[in-house]
């Protein structure tokens, strides 16, 4: 306390002399006080408030505190040394200066000494702290001036030594401070990095928790939805079984119903886990355990959950596979024909016909409608029963007929196939419907390696075996029992004792299959040959799934040789070979050369007919078909019959393969075209088809040349053309006309069909382009909109009109004039005679007014003319408006206006004459009559202009 009090007094006295020097001392003291307070009790409070998120800066503050404490100790040591020297030499006195000097005297270390008459204030400054000597003022004020002067000199010398020591320490201090600063900076960076990592972890924790929670929620919802879908599917299957009682009766009477679980619905797989854990089905709700990595979750549905569920035991319970999850809607599955899980009606009909040993055939009866939207009619003959249906395509019509036959047929349905229980069922893949062999074939195809199966016949054990040994080499199967002769029933006298033997059941036969995939070989065994194949395929899948797929690499020569050897070792029955292969084999045995050649190709590009010739030695056969493959096959069939007539060979080139059970050859899928050619020639077939297509079908059915269409001529204006097309079939020709080539071709085809005897008319297109004279432009009657104009100047005599034929229309651009020879040939109906044109030139005289010329022209052309005049009063005068209407069917109006009535009529008549002159210019030479001379029209037009200007 005394030391602190003394330091405070020194600071107050020094602040009066040099406030700037005291600032550094006060700052150091503040730090010293804070460090002292931390040492006493403040450190515990600081340490207690530390957290992993707060920087630990206590090391920095401690370092600065130690540095300041060392400086304070050095200063205190100097003061103590000064007191000791003073005690040892008490004669030392301080210097006394006169009061008249005033001001301050600078010392060596840069400080100033302030002097007065009564007291001397001395202040000394050091580099890192100021040491004040103010506390000596009261002690030295009473001493003599000489002693004071000597003491000041001695103290000045000591202060110089202290400054030298401090300068040396100051030179060493920056290096130490730089090293300590680097260490502190490194520690601070490490602490900041730790804090950032910790904050990032704290931020990621809630996100990961939320993501995991969402995944669990989605998985739970998915499992709930799947369990509901499976319950609905089970109810739907049970309802289907109730609707079809006949298969149930068959299942009840089948001998394998108890073993094969035939009560399971079609399309489901029986899992062995359901047989072992059948007591789990008595639970009230299904237990769902989520399984990751693509494995299917085990689900057990209880029959008690649904009120309509049948009461079945644990052995009859069915495990629904995961593949049926997508088929929640049964109706959509029946409609989609491409679904592989459900059999199509045609497939079921095939099974039904095979079960009842009867034949079935589809026949295309008729097709109607336009080419882009046809309707096909198909008839199914199933034994003695016939069913008909229609559809947008042939395939849809076939399926519709098959569906009707399945419902209405009286033939017994085949029983559903029982589920197989073998060793392969215990290790099924994730997809219950895909067998290991199918999965292996797909994998081998990706790798480009063939999967070849070969049966291995196990060696039969000998009929004898070693004594006291069974077939497995065990000794405890039989033993000798020696008993007395009186008690032993086997004792037969003469000391012979027969041994007792145990009779064991016969061991089940095991099947072995060798599977070779590329250069790898796998051996599979099982109770059946199919089970052995599945076992070998599973072993191959375990290894091949872990290997990388090598796509694009070619097989090595060794692998190719091995595959060729295996292919040669396989026995292939002749019934499974094609006729072409059999022809080549027989020719090879007899050292003959086989040659196939396409000699003729006829028909349009979309429906060609090929004729192929087969030559073997001196034998030649020909086959015809709609494709090269079909024609080649037919030629090979005929050649095969010829080759079988040859005498057998004495020594065959190679032994024939073992004969197997003859199997019925697979019928051609395209049964629908067996009688199509004869049906197309029927007049009742294809009534609604386009006449052009119908005519082509008839010619193809009769194997005649297709019709040839030729454009004869075209006439009329560019926008009102008329085309005439002629069709030629053998020696018959028929023309047809229409506003475009397509309709003219259709009309010609219809005329040819009528000529050939196909009298049923085909329906006209909905939007016909034919223009009937009694109708408007769009084929609609004018009705009430038709207006008849009666002209007083027109003669209106019907005998003088030029009438066209019943099927002809007036060609625009030609001026039809009344003529006495109107009943001439049809070729001259659309042309004007020379006399008529001369009269037309005499009518267009330049001396006549336009109104008179128009009246004369309309009278000559037998055209109705109507003139209407209107008067309108204006401020400038009276204005006359004239409207001239020409024609009755398609009237045309022309207007004119002027101050006088004659001028307005002439103006409207001039416009009407221009239209008629323009029509006359469109007449083309070349069979349509002479052309109006241009000079006559020019003179007529100039005369009308002059008259109008007058």
Curated annotation (Swiss-Prot):
UniProt-listed CDD domains: DSRM_STAU2_rpt2 (cd19882), DSRM_STAU_rpt1 (cd19857), DSRM_STAU_rpt3 (cd19859), DSRM_STAU_rpt4 (cd19860), DSRM_STAU_rpt5 (cd19861)
Region ranges (Disordered): 25-168, 202-274, 288-342, 758-833, 922-950
UniProt domain DRBM: residue ranges: 344-411, 435-546, 578-645, 690-758
Gene3D superfamilies (alphabetical): 3.30.160.20
InterPro entries: DRBM-containing_protein, dsRBD_dom, STAU2_DSRM_2, Staufen_C
One Pfam family in the UniProt entry: Staufen_C
Compositional bias ranges of the Polar residues kind: 45-66, 78-122, 254-274, 765-782
Covalent S-S links between cysteines: none
GO molecular function terms listed in the Swiss-Prot or TrEMBL record: double-stranded RNA binding; mRNA binding
Keywords on record: Cell projection, Repeat, RNA-binding
Listed GO biological process terms: anterograde dendritic transport of messenger ribonucleoprotein complex; germ cell development; intracellular mRNA localization; protein localization to synapse; regulation of protein localization
Annotated localization: Perikaryon; Cell projection
Tissue expression as described in the entry: Strongly expressed in nervous tissue (at protein level).
Any one annotated GO CC term: dendrite cytoplasm
Composition skew (Low complexity), residue ranges: 31-43, 67-77, 130-143, 153-168, 202-253
Protein function: RNA-binding protein which is required for syntaxin location in sensory neurons during long-term synaptic facilitation. Binds to syntaxin mRNA and is required to maintain its accumulation at the axon hillock following neuronal stimulation and at the opposite pole in stable unstimulated sensory neurons.
Entry protein name: Double-stranded RNA-binding protein Staufen homolog
Organism field: Aplysia californica (California sea hare)
């Amino acid at each position: 306390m005394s030391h602190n009090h003394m330091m405070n007094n020194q600071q107050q006295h020094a602040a009066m002399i040099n406030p700037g020097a005291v600032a550094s001392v006060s700052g150091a003291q503040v730090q010293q006080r804070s460090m002292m307070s931390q040492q006493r009790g403040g450190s515990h409070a600081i340490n207690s408030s530390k957290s992993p998120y707060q920087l630990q800066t206590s090391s920095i503050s401690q370092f600065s505190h130690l540095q300041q404490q060392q400086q304070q100790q050095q200063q205190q040591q100097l003061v103590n040394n000064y007191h000791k020297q003073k005690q040892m030499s008490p004669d030392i006195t301080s210097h006394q200066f006169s009061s008249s000097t005033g001001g301050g005297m600078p010392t060596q270390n840069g400080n100033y000494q302030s002097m007065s008459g009564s007291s001397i204030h001395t202040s000394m400054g050091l580099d890192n702290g100021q040491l004040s000597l103010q506390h000596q003022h009261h002690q030295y004020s009473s001493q003599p001036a000489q002693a004071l002067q000597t003491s000041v000199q001695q103290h000045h010398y000591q202060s110089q030594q202290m400054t030298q020591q401090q300068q040396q320490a100051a030179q060493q201090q920056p290096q130490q401070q730089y090293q300590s600063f680097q260490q502190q900076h490194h520690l601070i960076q490490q602490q900041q990095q730790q804090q950032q990592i910790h904050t990032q972890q704290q931020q990621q924790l809630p996100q990961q928790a939320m993501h995991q929670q969402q995944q669990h929620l989605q998985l739970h919802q998915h499992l709930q939805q799947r369990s509901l879908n499976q319950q609905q599917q089970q109810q739907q299957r049970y309802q289907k079984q109730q609707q079809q009682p006949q298969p149930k009766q068959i299942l009840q009477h089948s001998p394998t119903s108890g073993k094969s679980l035939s009560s399971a619905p079609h399309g489901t797989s029986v899992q062995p886990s359901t047989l072992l854990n059948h007591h789990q089905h008595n639970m009230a709700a299904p237990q769902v355990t989520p399984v990751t990595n693509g494995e299917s979750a085990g689900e057990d549905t209880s029959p008690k959950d649904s009120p309509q569920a049948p009461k079945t035991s644990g052995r009859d319970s069915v495990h629904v596979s995961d593949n049926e999850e997508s088929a929640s809607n049964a109706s959509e599955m029946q409609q989609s024909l491409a679904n592989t899980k459900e059999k199509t009606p045609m497939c079921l009909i095939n099974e039904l016909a095979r079960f009842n040993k009867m034949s079935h055939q589809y026949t295309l009866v008729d097709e109607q409608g336009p080419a882009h939207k046809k309707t096909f009619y198909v008839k199914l003959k199933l034994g003695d029963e016939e069913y008909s249906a229609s559809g947008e395509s042939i395939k849809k019509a076939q399926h519709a007929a098959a569906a009707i036959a399945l419902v209405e047929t009286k033939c017994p349905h085949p029983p559903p196939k029982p589920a197989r229980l073998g060793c392969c069922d215990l290790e099924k893949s994730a997809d219950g419907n895909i067998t290991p062999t199918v999965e292996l074939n797909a994998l081998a195809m990706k790798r480009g390696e063939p999967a070849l199966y070969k049966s291995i016949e196990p060696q039969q054990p000998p009929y004898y075996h070693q004594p006291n040994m069974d077939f497995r080499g065990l000794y405890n199967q039989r033993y000798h029992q020696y008993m007395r002769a009186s008690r032993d029933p086997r004792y037969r006298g003469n000391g012979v004792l027969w041994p007792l033997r145990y009779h064991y059941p016969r061991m089940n036969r095991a099947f072995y299959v060798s599977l070779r995939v590329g250069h790898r070989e796998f051996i599979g065994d099982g109770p059946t040959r199919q089970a052995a194949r599945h076992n070998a395929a599973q072993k191959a899948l375990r290894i091949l799934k872990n290997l990388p797929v090598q796509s694009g690499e070619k097989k090595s020569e060794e692998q190719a040789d091995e595959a060729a050897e295996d292919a040669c070792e396989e026995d292939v029955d002749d019934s499974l070979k094609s006729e072409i292969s059999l022809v080549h084999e027989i020719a090879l045995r007899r050292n003959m050369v086989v040659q196939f050649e396409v000699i003729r190709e006829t028909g349009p590009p979309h429906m060609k007919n090929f004729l192929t010739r087969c030559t073997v030695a001196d034998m030649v056969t020909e086959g015809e078909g709609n494709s090269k493959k079909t024609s080649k096959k037919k030629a090979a069939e005929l050649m095969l019959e010829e080759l079988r007539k040859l005498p057998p060979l004495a020594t065959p080139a190679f032994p024939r393969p073992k004969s197997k059970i003859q199997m019925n050859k697979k019928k051609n899928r395209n049964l629908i075209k067996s009688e199509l050619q004869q049906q197309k020639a029927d007049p009742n077939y294809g009534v609604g088809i386009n006449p052009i297509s119908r005519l082509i079908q008839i010619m193809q059915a009769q194997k005649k040349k297709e019709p040839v269409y030729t454009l004869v001529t075209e006439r009329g204006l560019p926008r009102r053309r008329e085309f005439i097309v002629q069709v030629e079939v053998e020696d018959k020709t028929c023309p047809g006309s229409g506003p475009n080539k397509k309709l003219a071709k259709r009309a010609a085809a219809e005329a040819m069909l009528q000529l050939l005897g196909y009298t049923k008319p085909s329906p006209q297109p909905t939007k016909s382009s034919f223009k009937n004279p009694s109708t408007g432009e769009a084929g609609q009657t004018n009705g009430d909109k038709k207006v008849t104009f009666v002209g007083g100047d027109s003669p209106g005599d019907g005998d003088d009109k030029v009438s066209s034929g019943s099927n002809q229309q007036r060609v625009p651009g030609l001026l039809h004039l009344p003529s006495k020879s109107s009943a001439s040939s049809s070729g001259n109906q659309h042309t004007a005679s020379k006399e008529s044109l001369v009269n037309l030139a005499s009518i267009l005289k330049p001396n006549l007014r336009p109104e008179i010329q128009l009246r004369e022209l309309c009278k000559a052309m037998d055209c109705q003319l109507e003139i209407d005049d209107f008067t309108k009063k204006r401020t400038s005068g009276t204005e006359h408006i004239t409207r001239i209407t020409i024609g009755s069917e398609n009237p045309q109006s022309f207007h004119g206006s002027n101050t006088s009535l004659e001028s307005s009529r002439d103006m409207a008549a001039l416009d009407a004459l221009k239209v008629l002159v323009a029509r006359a210019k469109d007449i083309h030479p070349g069979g349509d009559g002479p052309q109006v001379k241009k000079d006559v029209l020019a003179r007529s037009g100039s005369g009308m202009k002059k008259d109008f200007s007058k």
